[in-house]
Amino acid sequence: PICAETCPRNPAMEQVLHRFTSQVDEKYSHIVGRFRRELTHPQRTQETELGNLFADIFTRSLGVDVMLIGSGSIRAEKLGPIVTYGDLIEGFPYDDGVFMFKVTGQQLRQMLRYMLREEAYTGHTEFYQLPSTLRLRYDRRKGDFDYFTYCGREVGKEIGDDALFTVGLQNYHFKNIESFFNISYDTLCKIQKPRSVATSCQDILMEYFREHEMLDAAVDGRMTILPSTAQTG
């Protein structure tokens, strides 16, 4: 049996373990960011506060027109107002890189229309959080957009078929782009060969958190789905 007689204490080993666990605790309890308030991500098949914040951070940090964040990669239902390293890697655990590619306005519209098909609302496909540069309203009954606008260059301008956009996508999602967006790698290469623009999503977030305090985000209607997923999901 394991007891004090058969397994006497080893003070030297206890000291080593204590030092190790203290270092681990210090690393994971280190504060990496501060929000103005707690931000939420209650459901992955709808626009969320955390999803909006992350999509905007990556879009700005990487200098792309549109960053599409896999909604399922945000595992936390809430985060903040104090964000520790442990909170971040638990809430956004997949430390993937990012690929950038170019698409036309017509292709971007087709990609997001495919993303918003009916299977998305039952959890059978991936869903994406959008940056504030995009604003759209999708009508599930007709399977198309009421409007699909880009606000980065001209506010409220309807996206033309021939317009070109740089899009960022996490590596895992890029490798599965045909399954998730119904567009092939070969099709993307006809405009420009996709390339890696970042190796660590977590590093991008932490760097942005260091440079910007008291961050906030709101569900601002950038992605409106009718009827809403709350009514039907």
Predicted feature residues:
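Catalytic centers of hydrolytic enzymes
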Residues: 1-61, 65-233
